[in-house]
Amino acid sequence: MVAEIICVGTELLLGQILNTNSQYLAQKLAELGIDLYFQTTVGDNMERLKMAIDIATKRSDVLIFTGGLGPTSDDITKEAVADYFGLTLVLDEDILRRIESFFERRQVKMPQINKKQAYVPEGAKVLHNKNGTAPGLIIEKDGKIAILLPGPPFEMQPMFEEEVLPYLEKFSKQKIYSRVLKFIGIGESSIEEALKDLILSQTDPTMALYAKPFEVELRITTKKESEELAKSLLQSMEYRIRERLGEYIYGVDRQLLEEVVIGLLTEKKLKVSVAESCTGGLICNKLTNVPGASEVFDRGFIVYSNEAKMKLLGVPEQVLKEHGAVSSQTARFMAQGALSNSLSDIALSVTGIAGPGGGSETKPVGLVYIGIATKDNVESFEFRFSGDRLRIKEMTSKAALNILRKKIIDY
């Protein structure tokens, strides 16, 4: 079975709204083992929408629409689909009562235009909307299936989970199972080189690499009827990959680097403090976003100015004058200062030039030093990142968290 997603809305074409519906639906279809070869976005135009439907029916079995089910004149998805399949729209009294009740609960009189939403194509299965007034629809006609869903994600997602998912499961004999390995401290090309024989000979499971800022994801995928067999295949391939590159793998699936760090700190009963200059609190923010961080995160220092570095962390004025705020020496003193002015076992520091200005020939934009200190040792590491200010800050935070991760493992 082949599915196609058709997202309706001129606002999508204008870039005014981020289309998260396509991503969500694509993931759900993949989990079901339903092939998705095409995604289409079309504006609120009857002629162009019918054209998209005509193209989709020639190449796909299931058409999943999102958007265009509202009460206004530019909400035309239901009308376009009904007209294309030659179906008459009829008033559904049950839906009308639901819409009226929706407004009554809010003590608001129902606008007459909302009555439009109670008309459905004859013979369609109605999908109830618990969070809005637009019902969803499933239409089976001429060997094709059209599934119409509301555009707002908080309406669409519960409807899909509760009603569409069980409907589609009966068509899905095989499901797609996957495992994502998350790498850090190694580039995409180096991973591919190390796994070249596995990648070239892949049939089942398959592998695909995806580069992200300062990390790489490797997705292992298989399509099986049996979950037990799928897991066995994925685990076997993961073991072979870990044998070669295990030191660079920090997590799996949806794990975040900061979650792994907090988990390791908790496991070893350690506390950490962080001193940040160029990242301006980003590392502290990432760590404290993780539940349980309060047990292992002691404090953070945002020391943007030289005065703050001297006053709060005890960085010697002479060091700042001789080596500058962006230097390995300053990074080490910052880490030591954060350690001595806290109740932590480990202290992390970052200082750098995020840009776009402030760089020089000897110290260009993207130059970053990361320091880490324990009671027995202090180290610093140099990095040279590229990109805009936000990208450099993000990459710096990931590099710092990875250094912290490795230090905790060796502690």
From Swiss-Prot:
InterPro entries the record matches: CinA (IPR050101), CinA-like_C (IPR036653), CinA_C (IPR008136), CinA_KH (IPR041424), Competence-induced_CinA (IPR008135), MoaB/Mog-like_dom_sf (IPR036425), MoaB/Mog_dom (IPR001453)
Alphabetical list of Gene3D superfamilies matching this protein: 3.30.70.2860, CinA-like, MoaB/Mog-like domain
PANTHER family: NICOTINAMIDE-NUCLEOTIDE AMIDOHYDROLASE PNCC, NMN AMIDOHYDROLASE-LIKE PROTEIN YFAY
Family: Belongs to the CinA family.
Protein name: Putative competence-damage inducible protein
Species assigned in the record: Caldicellulosiruptor bescii (strain ATCC BAA-1888 / DSM 6725 / KCTC 15123 / Z-1320) (Anaerocellum thermophilum)
Organismal lineage: Bacteria, Bacillati, Bacillota, Bacillota incertae sedis, Caldicellulosiruptorales
